[in-house]
Amino acid sequence: MKALHFGAGNIGRGFIGKLLADAGIELTFADVNQTVLDALNARHSYQVHVVGENEQVDTVSGVNAVSSIGDEVVDLIAEVDLVTTAVGPVVLERIAPAIAKGLAQRKAQGTERPLNIIACENMVRGTTQLKGHVFNALAEEHKAWVEAHIGFVDSAVDRIVPPSASATHDPLEVTVETFSEWIVDKTQFKGALPTIPGMELTDNLMAFVERKLFTLNTGHAITAYLGKLAGHQTIRDAILDEKIRAVVQGAMEESGAVLIKRYAFDPQKHAAYIQKILGRFENPYLKDDVERVGRQPLRKLSAGDRLIKPLLGTLEYGLPHRNLVKGIAAAMHFRSEDDPQAQELAALIADKGPQAALAQISGLDAASDVVAEAVNDYNAEK
């Protein structure tokens, strides 16, 4: 089996690429970072530090790399059995034209073998969004063939992969936590279902997507925003602050109540899942910076993302949301010189005031009680 993976960054190498290579799949990475491409093609291997209670170093071998812009990547799309991505939500649109070209070439070659495409991004139904971008780039005459032969498979991914702090300055070395979860929608595959250790198949993906979004992502973001306000450097420092931990756990319990109501999750099992997530935030081997986790606050405050979506669930079911609102207020305070969205957020609040700014970003009603509550919390933190 051959696979092409877009994104040779830390998540690509340390999570999805590693699982594919470990499964004996012939793997090629596609990226724009020439340093990483050259290193992969020189060595065809790299090291992954898996950190936790039992630390280990795994070697991933037998990998190749191509530029994600150019003919080579198009040729590969025309011949592989699986395409995966870990490029970040905003980059999906940029790789879609190359995928569209590769699919057109696949059709022209008369390849009837199915191809499945899986976007492994921190977003809800990312592959469905990628499919939209690919279809925008496809000529009309290819669309029916692509619909029949190409599976666009949504997934939920979960593994904390902080930026590498390699002592050797090796551009390929990567550190990951022990925990990983890759859940895919088995109803969307074309052809036989693949057997890849570490890939879990489900016919109820949205329950797992929202469980991860409402727990790991919600908790991670609120820890980062409260941590930044309190002057903490890392997620671990922040979650060990008892005041912050109380709000983060409270917010995850509030979002969890939505999940329990919506998907009939077992309350005790979900409480244990929350504790597992808190334990991951405390991992002393992950130097996860609050500024990195907090970046792109406009996206994280949008209606379908980790702060507002669980809040909307609490409003839908008439459930408490006090701690979620505290997290939203903290997100509005996020400032970073290195993040254009943080600067845009600050400018929007300065121009329109917190009430109108939050309503515009989140889609919440500016006159609603919940926006007033968030603005009160925001002003109290000034």
Curated annotation (Swiss-Prot):
Task: Give a yes or no for keyword Oxidoreductase in this entry.
Answer: yes
Q: Name one Pfam family in it.
A: Mannitol_dh
Spell out the InterPro entries in the cross-references.
Answer: 6-PGluconate_DH-like_C_sf, 6PGD_dom2, Mannitol_1_phos_5_DH, Mannitol_DH, Mannitol_DH_C, Mannitol_DH_CS, Mannitol_DH_N, NAD(P)-bd_dom_sf
Catalyses which reaction(s): D-mannitol 1-phosphate + NAD(+) = beta-D-fructose 6-phosphate + NADH + H(+)
| Domain of life according to the entry | Bacteria
The alphabetized list of GO BP terms reads: mannitol catabolic process
User: GO MF annotations for this entry?
Assistant: mannitol-1-phosphate 5-dehydrogenase activity
Q: Which UniProt keywords apply?
A: NAD, Oxidoreductase
Q: Which PANTHER family match?
A: ALTRONATE OXIDOREDUCTASE-RELATED (PTHR30524:SF0), MANNITOL-1-PHOSPHATE 5-DEHYDROGENASE (PTHR30524)
Q: Which HAMAP family match?
A: Mannitol_dehydrog
* Name the record gives this protein: Mannitol-1-phosphate 5-dehydrogenase
Its encoding gene is what?
mtlD
